[in-house]
Design a protein with these regions (language model features):
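N-terminal Rossmann-like dinucleotide/flavin-binding domain of flavoprotein oxidoreductases
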Residues: 1-33, 118-136
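Glycine-centered tight beta-turn/hairpin loop motif at sheet-sheet or coil-to-beta transitions
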Residues: 26-28, 158-160, 254-256, 278-279
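Mid-to-C-terminal Rossmann-like scaffold of FAD/NAD(P)H-dependent oxidoreductases
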Residues: 211-304
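FAD-site-proximal beta/loop scaffold in flavoenzymes
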Residues: 53-77, 154-156, 161-234
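A short, polar/charged loop-to-alpha-helix boundary motif
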Residues: 301-316
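Glycine-rich dinucleotide-binding loop and its adjacent helix/turn
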Residues: 40-100
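Rossmann-like dinucleotide-binding cores of NAD(P)H-dependent redox enzymes
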Residues: 80-81, 88-145, 225, 243-251, ...
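Redox-cofactor binding/interface segments in oxidoreductases and associated redox assembly factors
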Residues: 25, 38-39, 170, 207, ...
Length: 317
């Protein structure tokens, strides 16, 4: 009320008319706008999984999802959880569940933990730390089916192995939620396409956060969201402002083996250099000229994050 904001909870948008500058709600109500910001977030990636219990596989992307997951664990008296995916979400859940006294088996077609963020040596350090706490990993195969097996489930892998569990969690990642925008004729690529002022190709329509692809960058983390919010607030208040992304290392919540990573750009030309022994590994990605383009720190090496971040180039200067 102090900010003169009306928040409508449990309200779904059916469509957007960018020509009439109107948002249509389910139920028929139409809301005109002078400027519209799309902050649609990200949606869970659902790999193709068959079996008579495929619909029982849970994913967690919001508080309601988390409550359903916790309720299922409690209702079943679950003690063992199978996790599909060993990336950021999968590893964080693995650590949390192990701390809660659960047994965890995780499956991922890649070769080590956090494969899209960490080089192999660093990912193996995370794997070893989680295995020491009791986790079991199946790297290489895909989960193809989830079937009911007594009071629990059987997860079938494409190498013929089976994982038995009381609950199955899908944690293969998220992608920008873009359907509402694309249905309205707004340009979409990996996310809702914007320039550095967060403008889409539709007049007076902006996008920010996990749903947006800002000047070619899709960054589904908190720090980029905050930078975008500050820039867009200034623009909407009359001071046109480009968003800037400094180097923004990501802290991954795996206390068994703390991780801080600032991945190099996908097209970066260089190679990884390693210092230390697991779990305390400092991995530096340097160009041929020696410029630091990214880093991955595990264990005690995370203490160097601030000093190393100062050496990195901006993501979007």
């Amino acid at each position: 009320e102090q900010l003169n904001v009306t928040v409508r909870t449990r309200t779904r948008v059916a469509s957007i008319d960018t020509h009439l500058q109107t948002v249509h709600l389910e139920g028929g109500e139409a809301l005109p706008y002078s400027e519209l910001v799309l902050a649609l977030g990200a949606e869970l990636i659902r790999p193709p999984i068959g079996g008579d219990a495929a619909e029982d596989v849970l994913g967690v992307n919001d508080l309601d999802d988390y409550r359903r997951f916790q309720d299922l664990l409690a209702a079943k008296g679950a003690r063992k959880v199978a996790i599909i995916g060993a990336g950021l979400i999968g590893c964080e859940f693995t650590n949390d569940l192990l701390n809660g006294g659960f047994t965890v088996e995780a499956v991922d077609p890649m070769g080590w933990c956090l494969p899209t963020l960490l080089p192999e040596q660093s990912g193996r350090a995370v794997q070893a730390a989680l295995e020491e706490k009791g986790a079991t990993f199946h790297f290489g195969p895909l989960a193809t089916e989830v079937n009911r097996a007594g009071e629990g489930y059987a997860v079938t892998l494409n190498n013929g192995d089976t994982i038995e569990a009381d609950a199955v969690l899908c944690a293969v990642g998220v992608r920008p939620r873009t359907t509402l925008a694309s249905d309205a004729g707004i340009e979409v690529n990996r996310g809702i396409v914007t320039d550095r002022q967060l403008r889409t190709n539709a007049p007076n329509v902006y996008a920010m956060g996990d749903c947006a692809e800002v000047a070619g960058h899709v960054l589904v983390y908190v720090a980029p969201l905050m930078a975008a919010a500050r820039a867009l607030a200034a623009t909407l208040a009359g001071e046109t402002t480009d968003v800037s992304y400094p180097a923004m290392p990501v802290a991954i919540k795996t206390p068994a083996c703390p991780v801080v990573v600032s991945p190099p750009a996908k097209d970066a030309d260089g190679e990884w250099h390693f210092e230390g022994d697991a779990p305390d590994i400092k991995a530096l990605f340097r160009s041929g000229a020696g410029e630091l383009l990214g880093f991955a720190l595990t264990g005690q090496a995370v203490k160097e994050r601030m000093a190393l971040a100062k050496e990195l180039p901006a993501i979007l200067g």
